[in-house]
Amino acid sequence: MTFTFHGGEPLLAGVSFYREVLPLLSKELSHMHPEFAMQTNLWLMDDEIADILAEYKVPLGSSIDGPEDLTDYQRGDEYFTRCMEGYRIAIEHGLLVRFICTFTNSSVKRKEDIVEFFKSQGWVMKLHPALPSLKGDNPNAWTLEPEEYGELLVWLLDYAITNPSFEIMNVNDLCRCVFTRSGAVCTYADCMGSTFAIGPDGAIYPCYRFIGMPEWVMGYVKDKPSIAELMESPAGKRMTAFKDHVDLACRDCAHITYCRGGCPYNAIAPTGGELEGVDPHCTAYKRAFDEIVSRMNKEMEAPAASPMQRRSRVKRMEKPAVMPLIKRIIEK
């Protein structure tokens, strides 16, 4: 079992909170072998907090969108500097830190700069597309459209193939999904009933992304509900309805086994809980999955051919071969 401390900003809880809660959870749930993780902007990281997090081997996730000017443009002045100072402290204490990058309709135009920045830092890259805001008068101000996101994923696939020392987690996940025919991360898997989030007041949600949305409260910790009871709540039933909808709407899709309609939050939250379709990024996922499957099939055709003949065929292809990348991913 993994406990992830997520935002708001979990470092606001202060060092005393973690000195109490980490030993408590480790002791009381020792039979479940608990592990911990944290998503933080790192601004409040200091030596004391870093010490206790390092003691319990808590990996950290944070957000950097690329070079300093681009990150500050998207996240506010001095975000980059403050985040990197916290990163420095965390690294000095031996903490593992990884960054996620948000691609917007603006930053995607600088994809080369962003990838080269991550590569120059020696970081593993993880990304997600900017989604329509659920608040404000201009919800699509930063939104990366699904078609553009799909082309970005294919571009990143080629980059990962031609730069084997640089790891892009999203590309790894897509390739692993196709090769194993199973969802590699929660976006491409039926997460219902296996993933929950708990708000500061003890409210239980289907996922951290629903926290703060009262209509998605499944129950409360104080009532000690079972998983079955949580799934019988109105919010739980809406999640199950999404799964049933995917079975019907995606039944003819070649990728249904390892995509499962994408993320339920992406599909349901923007519509006020109404089930109107699958994840809006279906177009992007399908574009990337189609590309991987097409290349993989071409490279694996005519298995009786000699190694020299197969290499010759791969060389004649206009697109970089994907199987060497998949082999590296699977063998990890």
Predicted regions and their residues:
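Flexible mid-to-C-terminal extensions adjoining Fe-S/redox cofactors in radical SAM and related proteins
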Residues: 212-332
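Alpha-helix boundary recognition
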Residues: 54, 91, 119, 161, ...
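Generic recognition of stable, solvent-exposed alpha-helical segments in well-folded globular domains
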Residues: 16, 82-85, 109, 113, ...
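Radical SAM/AdoMet-radical enzyme domain recognition
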Residues: 1-4, 13-134
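Active-site neighborhood of divalent metal-dependent phosphoester/pyrophosphate hydrolases
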Residues: 8
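Radical SAM enzyme [4Fe-4S]-AdoMet core and its adjacent flexible, acidic
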Residues: 74-192, 197, 201, 209-219
